[in-house]
Amino acid sequence: KYDFDTYTSDITANFEAMEGREVRIAGRMMSRRDMGKANFIDVADGKGRIQCYVRVDDVGEDCFNAFKKWDIGDIIGLSGKVFSTRRGEISIHADSLELLAKSLLPLPEKYHGLKDTDTRYRQRYLDLIVNPEVKDTFIQRSQILREIRAYLDGKGYIEVDTPILVPLEIGASARPFV
């Protein structure tokens, strides 16, 4: 178990109050830019995404060497101070890193994304990781359904699930979709 204390969206929304403060976040490593003894990585949690600066002098050589073997898609935890880069991007200067879960399959390339419609529908989990607009659509759908259910529940209605496709005939000669 990794005890994080901040979501990435809290850092970006309240940067003035958070600047210089030590934070602990956990999320999926979405990209890495290697610059020798320093790396910039993007970490996405359930509420947003933030850039993190990882330097060998700050995390230690053993930790940094282990970090270099991690893959895009791995779930990591890190702690560090919030700062702004020279270009003005809100970031975390990491002082410790921890691998929380290994990604068994690689994520699609960042710039090409996941474009194949068949793959997007068959591997919905991947679509939700790679395409934030798809995730936003699912979140909105969930909120709408929650409000409709709350309204109807308040009026005394009950919810009944009715199956849409049910095999009524079972066996070798059954032809339910004719």
Where would I find each of the regions flagged by the language model?
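Class II aminoacyl-tRNA synthetase catalytic cores and aaRS-like
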Residues: 1-178
